[in-house]
Swiss-Prot record:
Pfam families: ATP-synt_ab, ATP-synt_ab_N, ATP-synt_VA_C. F-type ATPases have 2 components, CF(1) - the catalytic core - and CF(0) - the membrane proton channel. CF(1) has five subunits: alpha(3), beta(3), gamma(1), delta(1), epsilon(1). CF(0) has four main subunits: a(1), b(1), b'(1) and c(9-12). The keyword ATP-binding applies. GO terms for molecular function: ATP binding; ATP hydrolysis activity; proton-transporting ATP synthase activity, rotational mechanism. InterPro entries: AAA+_ATPase, ATP-synt_VA_C, ATP_synth_F1_bsu, ATPase_a/bsu_AS, ATPase_alpha/beta_chains, ATPase_F1/V1/A1_a/bsu_N, ATPase_F1/V1/A1_a/bsu_N_sf, ATPase_F1/V1/A1_a/bsu_nucl-bd. It comes from Chaetosphaeridium globosum. Coiled coil: none annotated. Its EC number is 7.1.2.2. It is a peripheral membrane protein. NCBIfam families: atpD. GO terms for biological process: proton motive force-driven mitochondrial ATP synthesis. It catalyses: ATP + H2O + 4 H(+)(in) = ADP + phosphate + 5 H(+)(out). ATP binds at residues 170-177. This is ATP synthase subunit beta, chloroplastic. The gene is atpB.
Length: 493
């Protein structure tokens, strides 16, 4: 049975309410409707007609304010070029609705749910409004469980919560996209789940690069779209603020269908959550609201909460969200990142230093955090191993200045041993990715949490002190490291 909030497309035609444009200010317009025919807040309005040059116009807007005198103020989801006062505006009678279900996999959509990949129309039988309430408290799954990703450094040191929200921090060129693609690949293989990628206010070139890389690594299967593991929703930097403000909700709505109807585990990527806030700030100013701290919208917390509260685990399935967070001027106290942090369960920080060393994924083991890393959630064994790894790496970090000035020989025997183990740990935190096989030539590895814990315990206990550190670089589990060490020994002898 289909959830009541997902609507089967039918050919019923209702009488439309028609209004007229009275004022246009950039992406915002005022529309007058006949008395008694006012649209509701969040209703979608459509402007169709011809501009002065005789070209067709088709602009969708969303009602934001009821102004009195039978007027509403609406925000456009596409450019308002060519619109004129007096043009007819049709009230669709409902909120923006977008296609949902398997037909969305392997395709790219805009904020309105229209395909923009030149691969023909989407034959959707079910659509859903983008404005929906969060699941009721009675539907929520309150059990704290780890979402295993198969990536050693994440699962051991900053584990993700099933149905949680993770912040992904990292500059350009440190491997954000590859990490995202590997997570999409692993959730499909290990959890039978799908992913939805929401490109919110980022560069068009990056969206195109991601699409091409997904096709190359078979995350999107062009020959058989049904086998694709991801749906893409883009609202790029050059689009009006209305589109950038709502594209996150479009992606979330598609993810909710997979969770609520298909009962799947879903990964929702939002790149970048800051742009969602930024677009809201632009719209707020255009609507004439009084700005709050640092010029942000007064409704910042409400808007963020409305999006984030819909991302959760229910008894049917889960949406686990990974959100790239841009920090303006590296100021963590800025209202936009500060409001985002309140919702995050874990942070994955990518380090340029590790990327420069060739250690991929370049996840910083000391800066990345998770609320799930508690002994009563993950178990004593996991917790103790993770703390041991962090302690060893922290001590190695402290000793690096001494090593740089005086050299390794000046360290005590105990510290030399610790440095050797730390370097093995650092290399063992790297692993070959499935989606990078085409570039590296080495097959990808999915490492279970049990194998991960066992491997790091053996390094910490000193069982593998005799093995060379290069044996631990870009391998899966610890057995591969010992096999690689044996191969290296044969080659060197």
């Amino acid at each position: 049975m289909i959830n009541s909030s997902f609507i089967l497309l039918a050919s019923t035609v209702t009488s439309k309410k028609v209004g007229r444009i009275t004022q246009i200010i950039g992406p915002v317009m005022d529309v007058a409707f006949p008395s008694g025919n006012m649209p509701n807040i969040y209703n979608a309005l459509v402007v169709k007609g011809k501009n002065a040059a005789g070209q067709d116009i088709d602009v969708t807007c969303e009602v934001q304010q009821l102004l009195g005198d039978n007027k509403v103020r609406a925000v456009a989801m596409s450019a308002t070029d060519g619109l004129m006062r007096g043009m007819d505006v049709i009230d669709t009678g409902s909120a923006l609705s977008v296609p949902v279900g398997e037909v969305t996999l392997g395709r790219i959509f805009n904020v309105l749910g229209e395909p923009v990949d030149n691969m023909g129309p989407v034959n959707a039988t079910v659509t859903s409004p983008i404005h929906r309430s969060a699941p009721a408290f009675t539907q929520l799954d309150t059990k704290l469980s780890i979402f295993e990703t198969g990536i050693k450094v994440v699962d051991l040191l900053a584990p993700y919560r099933r149905g949680g929200k993770i912040g992904l921090f990292g500059g350009a060129g440190v491997g954000k996209t590859v990490l995202i693609m590997e997570l999409i690949n692993n959730i499909a293989k290990a959890h039978g789940g799908v992913s939805v990628f929401g490109g919110v206010g980022e560069r068009t070139r990056e969206g195109n690069d991601l699409y091409m890389e997904m096709k190359e690594s078979k995350v999107i299967n062009e020959e058989n779209l049904g086998e694709s593991k991801v749906a893409l929703v883009y609202g790029q930097m050059n689009e009006p603020p209305g589109a950038r403000m709502r594209v996150g909700l479009t992606a979330l709505t598609m993810a909710e269908y997979f969770r609520d109807v298909n009962k799947q585990d879903v990964l929702l990527f939002i790149d970048n959550i800051f742009r969602f806030v930024q677009a809201g700030s632009e719209v707020s100013a255009l609507l004439g609201r009084m700005p709050s701290a640092v010029g942000y919208q007064p409704t910042l917390s409400t808007e963020m909460g409305g999006l984030q509260e819909r991302i959760t685990s229910t008894k049917e399935g889960s949406i686990t969200s990974i959100q790239a967070v841009y920090v303006p001027a590296d100021d963590l106290t800025d209202p936009a990142p500060a409001t985002t942090f309140a919702h995050l369960d874990a942070t994955t920080v990518l380090s340029r230093g590790l990327a420069a060393k060739g250690i991929y994924p370049a996840v910083d083991p000391l800066d990345s955090t998770s609320t799930m890393l508690q002994p009563w959630i993950v178990g004593e064994e996991h917790y103790e191993t993770a703390q041991g790894v962090k302690k060893t790496l922290q001590r190695y970090k402290e000793l690096q200045d001494i090593i740089a000035i005086l050299g390794l020989d000046e360290l005590s025997e105990e510290d030399r041993l610790l440095v050797a183990r730390a370097r093995k740990i650092e290399r063992f935190l790297s692993q070959p990715f499935f989606v990078a096989e085409v570039f590296t030539g080495s097959p990808g590895k999915y490492v279970s949490l049990v194998e991960t814990i066992k491997g790091f315990q053996m390094i910490l206990s000193g069982d593998l002190d005799s093995l060379p550190e290069q044996a631990f670089y870009l391998v899966g589990n610890i057995d591969e490291a010992t096999a690689k060490a044996a191969t290296l020994q044969v080659e060197n002898s």
